[in-house]
Amino acid sequence: MPAFHPETADQNDLTGRVAVVTGANSGLGLETARALAARGAHVVMACRNPQKAADAVAEIAANAPGGVEAMPLDLASLKSVEAFAAAFRDRFAALDLLINNAGVMVPPFGLTAEGFELQFGTNHLGHFALTARLCDRLLAAPRARVVNVASIAHRAGRIDFDTLDTPPTARTYRATAAYGQSKLANLLFTLELQRRFTAAGVAATAAAAHPGWSSTNLQANLRIAELMNPLFAQSPAQGALPTLYAALMDAAAGGYFGPDGFMEMRGKGVAPAARTARAQDVSAAERLWTHSERLTGVHFDIPARRAPAAA
């Protein structure tokens, strides 16, 4: 695959399109929002910290012909997800791009507002509920795209279905295992969402991406990053390229993309990324979907597209 440059993307002119980017106040999310705004999209930066969000809006507003704004969203609270979706639906009739980018990585033990393990609750359940609550706006767009930002850490991930209802305690919590589980969940969610879009015959599609090893504040809890980043890490702008490819290329639907270099850690371009067998398990994807609907109390409504009437 040749090196990818957003300027040559299939969907390079985003004038009139609406995009939501979660976690857009810094790192990969900020670079993704910057690139989409520069191409004419109206970008909604969905962020937890209002001041950081305002600063990010000010940083990119001068090169955002379609406009950019911030709206509050805390993915660790399903009530916040519901409030964000309601506010968005009040103002926008359609959503063209939903970039599920925000996340937490190997933090100290914590729980979401509803009592889920923090990484699974934020990285997967929060985005699952957000996508479900915005689904009708996605289906109202001519050809919407949902992009879930995953990680090479999914390779070590396993979904422990037996314990999803009973989060770990501070004593039993394993941060790295929990992160891997949440990133595997991102890929299984993408797999099942794309399957359901296809089965319904709708124009919306889903794709996934990962940034390789990129230097962002997501690594604040990784002490090894202090040593590794100067040697191996790429910039947030470079790390955002797979996300932009997944969002803007027509053929990316259903795919998973990452850097094209050594071990997918970094690269000058974008290439299809490797998925483990667990990340391609259709039955596990459907099972996770069912569990996620039950845990969040939010259900998707993807009505089948009606065939045109016979002449």
State the predicted function of each range.
Residues 173-180, 228-232, 274-281:
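Active-site rim elements
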Residues 149, 249, 295:
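Phosphate/oxyanion-binding loops and surfaces in catalytic or ligand/nucleic-acid-binding neighborhoods
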Residues 196-276:
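SDR active-site lid
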Residues 48, 76, 233-237, 241, ...:
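Residue-level signal for the nucleotide or nucleotide-sugar donor/cofactor binding architecture
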Residues 2, 252-311:
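C-terminal tail/cap regions
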Residues 1-220, 298-307:
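Rossmann-fold NAD(P)H-dependent dehydrogenase/reductase core
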Residues 80, 126, 185, 235-238, ...:
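Soluble or luminal CAZymes and related metallo-dependent hydrolases
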